[in-house]
Amino acid sequence: MQIVYLFSSVLLTAALAHENGKVAYPFRLFNGTSSVEEISQQDQMDAPKIMPHVNATTFEWWYFDAVSTTSQNESLTVMFENMGPEGLGAPYPGGPLAVQISGSFSNGTAFTIITAATKGAVLEWGGGGVRGEWRGAGSSFAGKDHREYTVSIANPGIGVYGTMTLRSVSPPRYPCDVKERRASEQLIPNMYLANSQPDAIVEVDFNINESTLKFSGIGYHDLSWGSAPLESSVHSWYWGHGRLGRYSLVWFDVMGRDGKEYFSAWITEAGNVILCGCEPDSVLVRPWGENSGFPPGRGTPAPSGYSLRYDLGQNQIFIANFTREVNIIDNDFTKHIIGLFSGGFEGGEQYEGRAMADQFQFGDL
């Protein structure tokens, strides 16, 4: 299906030209051409990026996660999805709007719950703030100035109630730039990113089918979207975030279907940016231990962990190591995992912390 991009779409430019906006999405696909934003707009980091609505091959999701630093195994991820059936390759609930809730309890037991927003979704944005409500799913999120977000769920049909609150400790960014007007939002061809919270202090207080999930830890929030099915753009993908002492880290290392390797590196020290870029090998991620073939193909089990090498230039190298502990989502195409995190500058003080990581693997072995 043909996609018309931002610069050739007068309608999309007009729709997103104002700082304040509101859109209501129905629980059905758009049967036509969808327009996709590629260049950032002022104070619209969390605004919808696909207009007038997703069709069968496009997608966007508002993603929030939390990893406990007060217990070993606890985590929570909430994704507000707006997707065509071919967009993400995820379970399709009969319409484009769904909320996926996944996580793990202190005993290491993982769960995934998907609920459809059959009554549609409403998004409002302006002045750096945003509010989204997925109606029929009992789920919403709200944020202000990219500094604090709250995710709320009250859905008796799936037995999930609670709130997640995230307070930023690392400034917002795009794949290759800090937050600014008219920055490129492209992560890889046909895939885009706006990362409002690369790192956050998070508080989680949830009840999942009468089991308590309550902890403090590190959090993360972004908005991702695509102009073509994810599987058609990505062969394999390593992503993650973590905190080591005063350092906040995010990594993307993606092998595209075009055979090229794409990178997006981010490190802040006490909230100050010391690395932001997409240069080759700015962050090199490789699996280690069991199942450490590169690149991974569909059906490959999760590796023991990942080694990360950030190149800040001028002979400054930051080395980090992720050790897998809990598989939250584990299927032929997706690994969503939490684990131990350690590292620091070569020759400098070393730190320990926690991290969340994803591995996508759509290519054949």
Curated annotation (Swiss-Prot):
Its EC number is 4.2.-.-. Keywords: Copper, Lyase, Metal-binding. CDD domains: asqI-like. Pathway: Secondary metabolite biosynthesis; Alkaloid biosynthesis; Mycotoxin biosynthesis. Disulfide bonds: none annotated. One of its GO terms (molecular function) is metal ion binding. It catalyses: (1'E,3'E)-5-(3,3-dimethyloxiran-2-yl)-3-methylhexa-1,3-dienyl-quinolinone B = aspoquinolone A; (1'E,3'E)-5-(3,3-dimethyloxiran-2-yl)-3-methylhexa-1,3-dienyl-quinolinone B = aspoquinolone B. Quinolone epoxide rearrangement protein; part of the gene cluster that mediates the biosynthesis of the aspoquinolone mycotoxins. Within the pathway, asqO catalyzes an enzymatic 3-exo-tet cyclization to yield the cyclopropyl-THF ring system in aspoquinolone. The first step of the pathway is catalyzed by the nonribosomal peptide synthetase asqK that condenses anthranilic acid and O-methyl-L-tyrosine to produce 4'-methoxycyclopeptin. 4'-methoxycyclopeptin is then converted to 4'-methoxydehydrocyclopeptin by the ketoglutarate-dependent dioxygenase asqJ. Belongs to the quinolone epoxide rearrangement protein penF family. This is Quinolone epoxide rearrangement protein asqO. It comes from Emericella nidulans (strain FGSC A4 / ATCC 38163 / CBS 112.46 / NRRL 194 / M139).
